From Swiss-Prot:
An annotated GO cellular component: cytosol
Broad class of where this protein is predominantly found: cytoplasm
Name this protein carries in UniProt: UDP-N-acetylenolpyruvoylglucosamine reductase
Annotated FAD-binding PCMH-type domain residues: 21-186
The encoding gene: murB
GO biological process per UniProt: cell division; cell wall organization; peptidoglycan biosynthetic process; regulation of cell shape
Taxonomic placement: Bacteria, Bacillati, Bacillota, Bacilli, Lactobacillales
Record Gene3D superfamilies: 3.30.465.10, UDP-N-acetylenolpyruvoylglucosamine reductase, C-terminal domain, Uridine Diphospho-n-acetylenolpyruvylglucosamine Reductase, domain 2
Source species: Leuconostoc mesenteroides subsp. mesenteroides (strain ATCC 8293 / DSM 20343 / BCRC 11652 / CCM 1803 / JCM 6124 / NCDO 523 / NBRC 100496 / NCIMB 8023 / NCTC 12954 / NRRL B-1118 / 37Y)
Location in or out of the cell: Cytoplasm
Active site: R165, S215 (proton donor), E285
Stated family: Belongs to the MurB family.
Functional note: Cell wall formation.
EC number: 1.3.1.98
């Protein structure tokens, strides 16, 4: 169906768009090409009383087999990136890896930790993503969001309420539109060296040859999730087509047409086993949504 020349897909699978290559059907799916189109879609759903879910590149999401009700919006066509002196303004759907490369090309340091991290700028801000000693809250100075009342609001750093894998957008209903990164000048050679070092670590430690969400669990205080899982002898354990990676225990990989339910079942089994063995509850870093 069409809404002001915006294509809306009905009963459409999210699996082809997801990094896990798993996920159920959504009632309606749309991919806006502008903020105006995003507003039109949100208003349409609101008028019909439909729930709205907004996603970036589905790198940190598990959708159960029963799928999602209402309207699901993917922002990956909102991907403008503008470099202005030591600042980069990136749209929510921009690939974080691409933004990291733009920083390198302009001799701007601070995003090297993002080299090789899949996902969108919006998703990275939403989760306060980070790796190898770097994190979104160390480099983002402001964020623009579309609020539930239909207005665009600018959030300065303090108002973003960043925490470990947390931001204000997990509770205020705002849809992230763009983020401003404030970086530091450095030589391109030094920046590339740090990026290459991080990519080398990833290639050696992570199962990059299979679909996955990356790190499944948050780091529990005083522990490392991957080591707890490894010490629980859970590597190689499967539920359906999803397996605890033999290469990195903190990852779950889709090795044989796994489903969203397979991921969730394996997550619950790992949580239960680790808690019984060590008394530590593993909290998921990935988001699990939808109906069983």
């Amino acid at each position: 169906m069409q809404l002001e020349n915006i294509e809306i897909l009905e009963n459409h699978s999210l699996a082809p768009y997801a990094y896990t290559q798993a996920g159920g059907l959504v009632d309606y799916l749309a991919i806006p090409k502008s903020i105006h189109e995003l507003k039109v879609l949100v208003n349409w759903a609101k008028e019909l009383g439909m729930p709205v879910q907004v996603f970036g590149r589905l790198s940190n999401l598990i959708v159960r087999n029963g799928g999602l009700r209402g309207l699901s919006i993917l922002l990956h066509d909102l991907r403008d990136v503008v470099v202005d002196q030591n600042k980069i303004v990136a749209s929510a759907g921009a690939d974080l890896i691409w933004v990291t490369e733009q920083a390198f090309e302009h001799g701007l340091s601070g995003l090297e930790w993002g080299a090789g991290i899949p996902g969108s700028v919006g998703g990275a801000v939403f989760m306060n993503a980070g790796a190898y000693g770097g994190q979104v809250d160390m480099v983002v100075s402001s964020v623009t969001a579309l609020m539930p009342d239909g207005t665009l609001q600018n959030f300065e750093k303090k108002a973003l309420e960043f925490g470990y894998r947390k931001s204000v957008f997990q509770s205020n209903g705002g849809i992230i539109i763009s983020a401003t990164f404030e970086l530091q000048p450095d030589s391109c050679t030094a920046i590339r060296t740090r990026m290459d070092e991080n990519n080398f670590k990833r290639a050696n430690k992570q199962p990059l040859n299979y679909p996955s969400n990356g790190s499944v669990f948050k780091r529990p205080e005083g522990y490392f999730a991957g080591k707890l899982i490894m010490d629980s002898k859970l590597q190689g354990v499967r539920r359906g087509g999803v397996e605890v990676s033999k290469k990195h225990a903190g990852f779950m990989v889709n090795i044989a047409h796994g489903t969203g339910n397979d991921y969730e079942d394996l997550i619950h089994y790992v949580q239960k086993t680790v808690y019984e063995k060590f008394g530590v509850h593993l909290e998921t870093e990935v988001r699990i949504m939808g109906e069983r």
